[in-house]
Amino acid sequence: MTEKIDTRPWVEKYRPTQFDDIVLDPLNKKLLKNIIKQNSFPNLLFYGPPGTGKTTTIINLINKYQEVYKQKNKGLMIHLNASDDRGIDVIRNQINQFVNTKTLFGSGMKFVILDEVDYMTKNAQHALKYLIQQYSVNIRFCFICN
C-alpha cells in the first residue's frame, strides 16, 4: 500500500482553519469579533510583513461571519492574488463578473479578497475604485498588502 505524502509547505499544512484559532493581540481580536457580533462587516485593509497571518485572518474572519449568518458555502467569496494577475483584465473579467452575478441561494454579503493589492497597476486600481463605489452596498472588499 502506498502512503500519501503531504508535500504542502509547513505554513500551509498547519494554517489555522478556524477564526478562534488565530493568535492576535487582544485589541485586534476584539475588533474583529465585534464585526461578527454586530453584523457590520466593513471593507478591510490589512498590511504587514509577509507571513504574519493577514490572509489567514481575513479568510477565517469571513468564514466565521458566513457561518454565524448562515451564508457558508454559497459562492459568496472570491480570493485572488493581485501579484499573479496585476492588470485591469482581472478587474474587468473576474471581479466584475463575480460582483454582477446573482447569488444562487438568496441574499448574502459577497466578499472580494485581493491579496498583494499593492502590486496592482494604476489602471487596475482605478477600475477597482469604480467597482467599490458601485457595489459598496452588498459587496465587501478585503485588501491585503505588504
Regions found by a protein language model. Give the residues of each.
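P-loop/Walker A NTP-binding region and its immediately flanking N-terminal helices
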Residues: 1-146
